[in-house]
Amino acid sequence: MDYLDIKGINERKLKVQKQIDKIKEKAERVQNIKIQPTFKHMIKSTDIVKKYIIKHKRKVFGGMAINEAIRKKSKKDTFYTKEDFPDFDFYSPEPITDMVNISNLLVQAGFKNVSAKEAFHPNTYKIKAENYSNEIADISYVWSYIYYKIPTFVINGIHFVSPKYQIMDVYRILTNPMTGWHKIEKQYNRARLLEQFYILPETKQLLKKYKSKILDKRNTFKYVTTLKEKIINDIVENNKDIILVGDYAYNTLIKMSKINSYSKKLIIPDEISLIIKENNYDKFIDSIIKYMKKCKICTNKKKIKITKFSPFLELYDKSARISINGHYVIRIYSTEICLPYQVFDNIKIGTYHLIMLFLYSRKFRSSIAKNYKNNSIYEYMLANLEYARERYFKKKSKIGIERTPFRELQVECMGTEIFTPFHYYVLRKQGVKNRGFEYFPKRGIKTPAEMKKNYFYPNRSGNKEKDEIIINNNETVIKK
């Protein structure tokens, strides 16, 4: 009976449990040799993709790009090894052309059961071969004008997306707790490394740059400022379907951080920026218009303009900006994602990473539009928030997951009915006009021109789609 020492047995098994990761790695090495098709065989397919990417200067993003960026700074902190299957995620202005060409090259090289088709997320595509568990390539469509604006660095002929841009993709995952966290431990580690080696060092330089320089204050009329404040007090406050981001959210966090001379870091809000669930988007826009029509503090003859914009990449969805007499008042962003928030004074404010993601997105959009003034303002805000967060955590002796204004990895998010990417994929497949792209070379080799026929990419340029102008309370309506 002495052998059945329950405590001792449990301690022994705990020691085994600590070795599980190493045992799994050993099993994976054996699997790569024994399971068909073998790792050695399939690695040849990624060589074909790699050569294609180099030849056509496609832009690699994701884990591989982050790993190479980290390698430049610290080889010991890289997370991929030679035993990992190459993970080629790349942006393309012509994904259909690339998929057909790569698929045909794989067939020519002797690979069987090659398939290229649309993935779960809109504007994303994947290539597989021989029923192998890993994708050969994952391709994301980016409109050509924006594509050539994405910053990169080059190693061995491959264009990798730069950390400044890559951090937005990582923050997108950190702010999607319901459907984006299945590999959260990896993504958080990647965010940490990018911040350590790139974001924080740059923040230090920016803080020096703006230390003695006060940004030009935005000009605004008193009645416009009062109107914004009234919208926040009368409509935004206590509204469970709205999350504030942008200027007002930035000012809230800066105030709560209590950093030295924090009042000097506050900015004059350009407009109210908020995010609302997609099913309430149109109704909310109508309610804002009705409210502004009744504005008693505005000038007698009001010109209210609603400018609608397409989604911008995967960074934010469709939006509408409402202005009065040429002055911005509010911009409303739609979302289908359950986004995390915190509540201050009965107003939902985006979490730290959600606000940072929004500011990075707007900064990139400003750089594309060559709006250098706004680009500098967003740069200034990002640096201040980064500094405010770290100073707050250090002063309060927090690690970051506690309930504070700068809390990370918050699970609570806006929305009650959440649908997965697979749900939206099924809806797209059921659509009449576009059932999704699919190409199977074994059914007959096709050219890119044949496969692109009648296929249209969704518009995610972030460009203006139309204006609706209401003059003097419905006196005239003009649509452009």
Report each predicted region and the residues it spans.
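Amphipathic alpha-helical segments
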Residues: 95-109, 278-295
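Active-site nucleotide-donor binding segment shared across nucleotidyl transfer reactions
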Residues: 42-96, 100, 227-282
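Phosphate-handling catalytic interfaces
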Residues: 149-178, 182, 338-365
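Helical scaffold of the NTase/Pol beta-like nucleotidyltransferase catalytic core
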Residues: 1-68, 178-252, 464, 471-480
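Conserved catalytic core of two-metal-ion nucleotidyltransferases
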Residues: 104-148, 291-340
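Residue-level detection of beta-strand-connecting loop/turn positions
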Residues: 1-8, 131-133, 157, 326-327
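C-terminal, non-catalytic extensions of nucleic-acid polymerases
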Residues: 2-17, 21, 30-31, 203, ...
